[in-house]
Amino acid sequence: KILAEISPIDETMSEDIKEEIANIQEEKDIVRRILIADDSTVARKQVQRAIEGLGFEAIAVKDGKEAYDKLAEMAEEGSIYDQISLVISDIEMPEMDGYTLTAEIRRHSGLKDLHVILHTSLSGVFNQAMVERVGANEFIAKFNPDELGSAVKAAVSG
């Protein structure tokens, strides 16, 4: 939080990405809702502002357990794919981390095909290997608005 105040991050997403996502939304009937899981209020709000700027509604939760409980509850109400486009999750969180959240999503019959993007300040070969092992669709670094926008575009166009 302090770092965000003394050295603000550019949260501006390129107009090209916004336009490309708007075009996809015109061509396809996509669900304009994304679940965000991050224990950092600052990071959660950054992602939320970015996806709301793309015309999506955000469901924001503070950890993986809360995310999984919300997704499971939604799946009981009907097809999750009619309610949400994708999940963007931090990796390091209390209660349930992003790796475990992804693995639990893949094990749940009503959630298993949900698109999951792991969004983290961590980097390295180990993380990429873990991302692949738990079955996440994508791994992106915090906080690059264009990279986030491109990942959302790939998820909704696929």
Which residue ranges define each predicted feature?
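C-terminal catalytic ATP-binding subdomain
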Residues: 1-25, 54
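Charged docking surfaces used in two-component/phosphorelay signaling
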Residues: 45-53, 65
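Short hydrophobic/Thr-rich beta-strand motif most characteristic of the beta2 strand and flanking loop
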Residues: 55-62, 68-71
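Acidic catalytic/metal-coordinating carboxylates
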Residues: 63-66, 82-85, 97-101
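Active-site T/S-Asp motif of two-component receiver
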Residues: 89-90
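Receiver (REC) domain active-site loop signature in two-component systems and cognate sites
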Residues: 93
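Alpha4 helix (beta4-alpha4-beta5 surface) of REC/receiver domains from two-component response regulators
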Residues: 100, 107, 112, 122-141, ...
